[in-house]
Design a protein with these regions (language model features):
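Nucleotidyltransferase catalytic core that binds NTPs
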Residues: 2-175
Length: 175
C-alpha cells in the first residue's frame, strides 16, 4: 500500500459511473466498501475460487497470450459475454473473423458476480462450448473466462474490458 486517502466519494462516483444514484449497482457496491481509498502496486496472491471452480475455463492474461502464441494466431478477435451466446453472437464472431482475416476468436466470459437473474457460469460455459463444437471450424475458437464482477460503469467499463483483452493478446474486440 502506497497511499490511503479519504477521497471525495462523490467525485469518484461521477467520474466512474456518471451518477450517484444509490440504486445503481456499481454505485451501491462502491459505496458499501467505505470511504477510504487504497492505492499502490498490485500483487496477485490468489485467484479466489475461479481456478478451482472453473479449471477448464479460467485463464490469466499471460496464459491466454501463451496459448495464442502456441496456436500461431496473430489476429485475434475477442468476444466478451456474461450470457450464453445465441445465433447472432455466433454470426458476429464469424463476420469479424472473416472481415479481419483473423486467425481465431477468444470467447471470454465473465465468471464473477453478474446481474441478478443471469445464467450461472457453469451453464454458460457448457452451452458456449457446445455451440463452438457444433458450429465453428476446429481450432478457430478459444473459450476462456476470467474472474471479474460487473461494475455497470458503462463506456468506461467497456474500455477496461478492452484493455483486459488486449493484455491477453487480442488485436480486436467485438463491442
Amino acid at each position: 500500500i502506497e497511499t490511503l486517502s479519504d477521497e471525495d466519494v462523490a467525485t469518484i462516483l461521477d467520474k466512474v459511473f456518471r451518477t450517484d444514484d444509490p440504486e445503481h449497482p456499481g454505485v451501491a457496491a462502491f459505496t458499501a466498501q467505505g470511504r477510504t481509498v487504497i492505492s499502490g502496486p498490485i500483487e496477485v496472491l490468489n485467484y479466489s475460487y475461479f481456478e478451482e471452480d472453473f479449471p477448464d475455463t479460467f485463464r490469466t492474461a499471460m496464459t491466454i497470450r501463451s496459448e495464442i502464441a502456441e496456436r500461431g494466431w496473430e489476429r485475434v478477435v475477442a468476444f466478451q459475454t456474461r450470457n450464453p451466446m445465441h445465433r447472432a453472437h455466433e454470426e458476429l464472431c464469424r463476420m469479424a473473423m472473416e472481415d479481419l482475416s483473423a486467425d481465431g476468436v477468444l470467447i471470454h466470459m465473465l465468471l464473477g458476480k453478474l446481474k441478478p437473474g443471469d445464467i450461472p457460469a457453469d451453464v454458460r460455459d457448457a452451452s458456449i462450448r457446445k455451440m463452438v463444437d457444433l458450429y465453428f471450424p476446429p481450432n478457430s475458437v478459444m473459450v476462456t473466462g476470467y474472474g471479474f464482477d460487473m461494475l455497470s460503469a458503462g463506456p468506461r467499463e467497456a474500455v477496461l474490458h478492452a484493455v483486459f483483452r488486449q493484455n491477453a493478446g487480442c488485436t480486436h474486440l467485438i463491442v
